[in-house]
Amino acid sequence: MNLLRWLPNLNRTIWILAAGRLLSQVGTGFTLFYLPIFFVNEVGLSATAVGAALGSASLSGMVGRFWGGAAIDSPAWGRRRTLLISMLISSLGSFALAFANDLVALVLGNLLMGLGIGLYWPATEAVVADLSPLEQRGEAYAITRLADSIGLGLGVVLGSVLIALAHAYRALLIADGLSFLIFFGILYAFIAETIKPNQKQHTGLKGWKIALGDRSFLIYIAVNILITTYLAQINSTLPLYFKNFARQGLGFSELTIGTLFAWHLGLAILFQLPIARWLKPYSYARGLMISIFFWGTGFGLIWICGVAPAGGLIWAVLALGLMAIAMASYTPTASALVVALAPDSLRGVYLSLNSQCWAIGYLIGPALGGAAMDRPPGLANGYWLMLVGSIPVGLTILKALERQLQRVSRSTDLEYTNHSS
């Protein structure tokens, strides 16, 4: 009972959505960290080719996000129908990857996955915002992200065991496709449309022009692309680095890699809600500064994991722990900031552009990381120092965002802090 009292009192539909996201993310966790290893070490493609193929999902994701951003603000489409279509497309992408044996098929599967994900994220984030009052919005996003992390963690653990025992990569991809179909059923049966029937609608490109003319939002977009490039390293570059370069080239086994990422997700689960509550007194910009600091420290420890003569596993554990804190600090803060900036009638457009940052970050991140992993150990190790070197850039942009939000707050009486979200 004490645990139940500790949980926020959210709309019932948010809990149902979180349950569906958890089940879907179990399927994603089956394959998320193993796709690069499978297609490089088992299928025989180069790390550069696989990185580019994984990044191709971002191209179709951009299309999906633009389509989804307009669709979810339209009463004719809305949040629910967009979510249902996204699940069907994502399941097709998983099944395509399950039977891929060459680069063309790998790219096709990733293009479908990217399109489905592009439609999914703006719609699901809009549903959470629609159903949560301002004072609960940060915790509502934390709960849905918590469900994502629990599902991913379970999927990673189960996936690593099955891969260690049977190398059943393709079976896990099929299971991922089935998880999307299960989520489709939950959405169809239990999630009603949340868009307001009388909501004002902006036709044509007007809504996009308003969003792209928002100076605060544009500054946020710049730093968000950088942070999502960091996020992309976790499931695209890090698994291959751990396998082929960690411990001065000795690497870790698939089971060890799976355990490391289960640890990472476990900490993200443990910290998600406490960190969301801890960040309430801080401005959104300060919350993102905290996140970016932990990203930089984590990347530095990954470099040590590769070059240290001993203790590589310990450094990997510490690095992924810090990255879990970075992720838990980032996700609810970023989503709540975007909703705070967006007019209600343009919530889908703003969330779509926010999601585009993920598409761009996941286009740049795997391509850069894959190219680095095709280089000699010195360059592969140095890649992490390059990421550390980008941290001051992110902090500088966030200081500019903080000043801009303070100016807007003084002129509009709006307060851009987590306790108003």
Regions found by a protein language model. Name each.
Residues 1-11, 193-222, 416-421:
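Juxtamembrane intracellular "pre-TM" segments in multi-pass secondary transporters
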Residues 64-77, 271-284, 373:
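Helix-to-loop junctions at the C-terminal end of transmembrane segments
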Residues 179-197, 397-402:
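C-terminal membrane-cytosol helix-exit motif in multi-pass small-molecule transporters
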Residues 63-99:
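Conserved MFS/SLC helix-loop-helix module at the cytosolic interface between two early adjacent transmembrane helices
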Residues 8-58, 218-223, 227-260:
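Helix-loop boundary and gating motifs at the non-cytosolic
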Residues 111-148:
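Cytoplasmic helix-loop-helix junction between adjacent transmembrane helices
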Residues 164-178, 371-391:
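A membrane-interface helix-boundary motif in multi-pass transporters
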Residues 81-95, 286-301:
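Structural signature of the two symmetry-related core transmembrane helices
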